[in-house]
Curated annotation (Swiss-Prot):
Assigned protein family: Belongs to the UPF0502 family.
SUPFAM superfamilies from the UniProt entry: Winged helix' DNA-binding domain (SSF46785)
Pfam family, one: DUF480
UniProt name for this protein: UPF0502 protein Gura_3445
Top-rank lineage group of the source organism: Bacteria
Length: 219
């Protein structure tokens, strides 16, 4: 099932998972608490400034996909929870890794280990790589490994709930063919000549103006 969730929906889902793991005593979340979590300044990239109406619309779309639901158990205030543990049957470590990818975008296994530990214990980078491998083998995959960036040793991983990530084209352009190089050189030479001709014409016009002024003076 291809999800192609919008950025706001990804943020909501990541926040619901994060708060379930970090503050279970306050979970599920009220609309106000969830909105504040979405707009949180720490552990978020990019930063957002969502209104409650934006969050409601996102929750409705997630609910239609079976990824979030409303609950009023134990109180009068409507509260919201995610449904990934029900639909995907993921353990807390896998949920924490997914939440971190949703909240901060593509990251290396080392970055995920350091940042997701606030949600659940992660023994080492190898255990995170094992989790990522399982998420990549999910049907359909929930995570993908991105091509290594120029100048970086480690590869990054991205969640696929928003579809395939847009990647910058880091492939260097091939060198121009000899014929094109000759044409480019000729074009540059002609451009220089045009500039020189224009400068000479301006000088001639200035000289003519000066001569005319002198002629008027001596008449």
């Amino acid at each position: 099932m291809k999800m192609n969730l919008a950025e706001v929906e990804i943020r909501i889902l990541g926040c619901l998972i994060e708060k379930e793991l970090t503050t279970p005593e306050n979970y599920p979340l009220s609309l106000n608490t969830l909105t504040n979590a979405c707009n949180q300044k720490s552990n978020r990239a990019p930063l957002m400034d969502l209104a409650e109406a934006d969050v409601v619309r996102g929750l409705d779309k997630l609910g239609a996909r079976g990824l979030a639901r409303l609950t009023t158990t134990g109180g009068r205030v409507a509260k919201y929870r995610h449904s990934l543990d029900d639909s995907l049957h993921l353990a807390p470590p896998a949920l924490a890794v997914l939440a971190e990818l949703m909240l901060r975008g593509p990251q290396t296994a080392g970055e995920l280990r350091n940042r997701a530990e606030r949600m659940t214990p992660l023994a080492d980078i190898a255990s995170v790589e094992e989790i990522l491998g399982a998420l990549m083998e999910f049907g359909p995959p929930l995570v993908t490994r991105l091509p290594r960036q120029p100048g970086r040793k480690e590869q990054r991983y991205a969640q696929l709930f928003a579809g395939e990530p847009d990647l910058p084209d880091d492939t260097p352009a091939p060198p121009p063919e000899p014929a094109r190089q000759r044409v480019m050189a000729e074009n540059e030479r002609l451009a220089r000549l045009d500039g020189e001709v224009s400068a000479l014409r301006a000088e001639i016009a200035s000289l003519r103006s000066t001569i005319e002024e002198l002629r008027v003076l001596f008449e």
